[in-house]
C-alpha cells in the first residue's frame, strides 16, 4: 500500500504543520499542491494513500473559474480513475451539521476540523480514511 499523501492546502502555516506531522509522526511521503491541474494529474497517476483537502481554497482555479475544495473533491469522486482515493476534508468551517453536509456533498471519506493542534488526532484521522 502507498504511503503517499496529497495535501491540498493554501495556508503556509497549515502546510508546514500538517506536512511535518505526516512525515515525522506518520511516516508518510507528502505532495503539496493547490493547483487543480496538478492535483488531478497526481491523483490520476495513482499510488496515493489519501488526499487531505482544504475546503476553502483561496487561490485555486479550474478552467478560468475560482474553485474550492468541495468542487475539487467532487471532480475527483466523479472520475473513475480517482474516485477510490480516500479524501479527508479539512476545514475551519466546523459548525454543527457541517461535517455531515460536506461529506454528503462531496463523497469524501473523512472530515477534520481546523485548526489542527493535536498531531495524534491528525495521524488517527488520516489512518482512518486510508483504511476505509
Go through each PLM region and give its residues.
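Acidic, metal-coordinating helix/loop segments flanking the phosphotransfer/catalytic sites
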Residues: 32-50, 54-60
Amino acid at each position: 500500500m502507498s504511503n503517499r499523501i496529497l495535501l491540498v492546502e493554501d495556508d503556509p502555516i497549515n502546510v508546514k504543520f500538517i506536512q511535518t506531522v505526516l512525515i515525522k509522526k506518520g511516516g508518510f511521503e507528502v505532495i503539496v499542491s493547490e493547483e487543480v491541474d496538478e492535483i488531478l494529474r497526481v491523483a490520476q497517476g495513482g499510488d496515493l494513500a489519501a488526499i487531505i483537502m482544504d475546503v476553502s481554497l483561496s487561490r485555486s482555479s479550474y478552467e478560468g473559474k475560482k474553485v474550492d475544495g468541495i468542487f475539487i473533491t467532487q471532480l475527483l469522486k466523479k472520475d473513475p480513475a480517482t474516485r477510490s482515493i480516500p479524501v479527508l476534508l479539512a476545514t475551519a468551517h466546523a459548525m454543527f451539521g457541517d461535517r455531515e453536509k460536506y461529506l454528503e456533498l462531496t463523497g469524501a471519506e473523512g472530515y477534520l476540523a481546523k485548526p489542527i493542534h493535536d498531531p495524534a488526532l491528525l495521524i488517527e484521522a488520516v489512518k482512518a480514511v486510508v483504511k476505509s
